[in-house]
């Protein structure tokens, strides 16, 4: 019995390197995205989808031309960024949400109930606050993400987000007090 175990052990030791060599032709398993990268991608996707929905609402409801133009810019820029993020997330094995979360739905519902100057004011106030938070989120991801594609995406979008903040502040200022 001891001799049988010894032979079985020897056979396993000899076969293991041969089996390992056969496996070299297979692609390595996909790296699991870090929790921070996944969280960033999901938050960015949620925010991006919300920006598009709210931008469309602004195009329909805004009475101030600067607010209306800002809304259209949000639709254009965030639609493009959402497509880019989806491709990066898919490559990294990160599942993104298909719709905005409950908080963003509440924001939409609240703004959709407004019209005229009240809508313009509330929308621009939200966009200023939201873009400040977006910039902080993207700055953190551009420095600390463990996934280089996510890190580069965040860094590449920062100038656009800063421009959006400036535009939102200008639209807000055009409304007066």
Predicted features and spans:
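Repetitive helical segments and hydrophobic/amphipathic motifs
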Residues: 12-14
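His/Met- and acidic-residue-enriched segments that coordinate or traffic transition-metal cofactors
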Residues: 2-7, 18-177
């Amino acid at each position: 019995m001891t001799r049988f175990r010894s032979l079985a052990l020897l056979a396993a030791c000899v076969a293991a390197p041969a089996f390992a060599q056969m496996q070299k032709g297979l692609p390595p398993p996909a790296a699991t995205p870090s929790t921070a990268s996944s969280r960033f991608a999901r938050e960015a996707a949620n925010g991006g989808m919300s920006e598009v929905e709210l931008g469309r609402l602004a195009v329909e409801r805004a009475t101030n031309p600067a607010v209306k133009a800002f809304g259209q810019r949000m639709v254009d820029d965030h639609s493009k960024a959402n497509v880019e993020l989806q491709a990066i997330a898919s490559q990294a094995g990160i599942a993104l949400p298909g719709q905005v979360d409950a908080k963003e739905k509440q924001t939409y519902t609240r703004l959709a109930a407004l019209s005229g100057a009240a809508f313009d004011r509330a929308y621009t106030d939200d966009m200023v606050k939201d873009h400040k938070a977006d910039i902080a989120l993207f700055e953190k991801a551009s420095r600390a993400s463990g996934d280089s594609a996510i890190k580069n995406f965040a860094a590449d979008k920062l100038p656009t987000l800063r421009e959006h903040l400036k535009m939102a502040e200008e639209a807000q200022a055009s409304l007066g007090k």
